């Protein structure tokens, strides 16, 4: 059954999002906090994209992937943050059935695309460290473009499968989602249909895309560590370790929180705890990613310094 047909057959045409709290004082504090996180996410990721595009020294496969990661992080957080922030001003926080399905599809699609992109980035680092002389011939512009396109296509096709399996179900009420956006566990809990097949589909998608990506990342970083130990110069080892440490930090944060939420049975869902975890992987991680890469990356710092020096000259 398609999502449109499911919408027509369901007695529920819209959902009510409970958000975080009903206390006005806490709502004001949370609004300011989340607005600050979202604006920081936009500022840092956009700055990183423009910095990479504007500096020819950063026109390499590694930074091509990094600029796409920043773009995904902007879209990923934007699937949740704007709607969540406006909901603070409404007594009844409603979202249509189709709007809920669209939010879920876009959010999960961007999240799975990021998982696949991080796998491509790990392969890029492995090629750079293990075969530095052959690296330019291995990581060609065409291959990098195909890897990025493949990440988006794979992510959104997987998301389409997940969204179709959930929103084809019948929803007859209640329609109250005890969450701040249309995430999988709280939406699935509202269905009047048997959700076993949907849970199996979700498990298979998460294991196939997320689990396989995580396994490939572990294998890649195993080879990378082995290659780093063979680098003769201490400076070369330090530079390689610095770059890989940034990647590993991002991978651990994203996969750790996402797999925790999406690979558990719906019966183990705890509202308060899982809302905090959801805030972390939907809002905090997209803000931290550019900071992690920027603060530990000499080339990014040098490019930023050039921009600041240029502004001083023209001011």
From Swiss-Prot:
Glycosylation site list: 8
UniProt keyword list: Cell membrane, Disulfide bond, G-protein coupled receptor, Glycoprotein, Membrane, Olfaction, Receptor, Sensory transduction, Transducer, Transmembrane, Transmembrane helix
One GO cellular component term noted in the UniProt record for this chain: plasma membrane
Membrane topology summary: Multi-pass membrane protein
SUPFAM superfamilies to which the protein is assigned, alphabetical: Family A G protein-coupled receptor-like (SSF81321)
Transmembrane segments: 29-52, 61-82, 104-123, 143-161, 199-222, 240-262, 276-295
CDD domains, alphabetized: 7tmA_OR5A1-like
InterPro entries, per the entry: GPCR_Rhodpsn, GPCR_Rhodpsn_7TM, Olfact_rcpt, Olfactory_GPCR
Molecular function GO terms recorded: G protein-coupled receptor activity; odorant binding; olfactory receptor activity
Extracellular compartment spans: 1-28, 83-103, 162-198, 263-275
Cellular compartment(s): Cell membrane
Cytoplasmic domain ranges by topology: 53-60, 124-142, 223-239, 296-315
Described function: Odorant receptor.
UniProt family annotation: Belongs to the G-protein coupled receptor 1 family.
Protein name per UniProt: Olfactory receptor 5A1
Biological source species: Homo sapiens (Human)
């Amino acid at each position: 059954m398609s999502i449109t047909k499911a919408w027509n057959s369901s007695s529920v045409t819209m959902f009510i999002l409970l958000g975080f709290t009903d206390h006005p004082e806490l709502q004001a504090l949370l609004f300011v906090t989340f607005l600050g996180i979202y604006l920081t996410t936009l500022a840092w990721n956009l700055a990183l994209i423009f910095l990479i595009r504007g500096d020819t020294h950063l026109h390499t496969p590694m930074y091509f992937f990094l600029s796409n990661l920043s773009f995904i992080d902007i879209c990923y957080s934007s699937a949740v943050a704007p709607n969540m922030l406006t909901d603070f001003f409404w007594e009844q926080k409603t979202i249509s059935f189709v709007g809920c399905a669209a939010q879920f599809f876009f959010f999960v699609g961007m999240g799975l695309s990021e998982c696949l992109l991080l796998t491509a980035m790990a392969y890029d680092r492995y090629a750079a460290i293990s075969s530095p002389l052959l690296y330019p011939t291995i990581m060609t512009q065409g291959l990098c473009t195909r890897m990025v396109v493949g990440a988006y296509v794979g992510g959104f096709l997987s998301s389409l499968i997940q969204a179709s399996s959930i929103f084809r179900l019948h929803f007859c009420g209640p329609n109250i989602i005890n969450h701040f956006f249309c995430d999988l566990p709280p939406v699935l809990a509202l269905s009047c249909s048997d959700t076993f097949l949907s849970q199996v589909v979700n498990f298979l998608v998460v294991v196939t895309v997320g689990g396989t990506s995580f396994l490939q990342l572990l294998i890649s970083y195993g080879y990378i560590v082995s290659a780093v130990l063979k680098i003769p110069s201490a400076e070369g080892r330090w530079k390689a370790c610095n770059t890989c440490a940034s990647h590993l930090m991002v991978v651990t944060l994203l996969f750790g929180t996402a797999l925790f939420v999406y690979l558990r049975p719906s019966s183990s869902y705890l509202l308060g705890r899982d809302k905090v975890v959801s805030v972390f992987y939907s809002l905090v991680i997209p803000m931290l990613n550019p900071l992690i890469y920027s603060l530990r990356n000499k080339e990014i710092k040098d490019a930023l310094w050039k921009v600041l020096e240029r502004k001083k000259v023209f001011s």
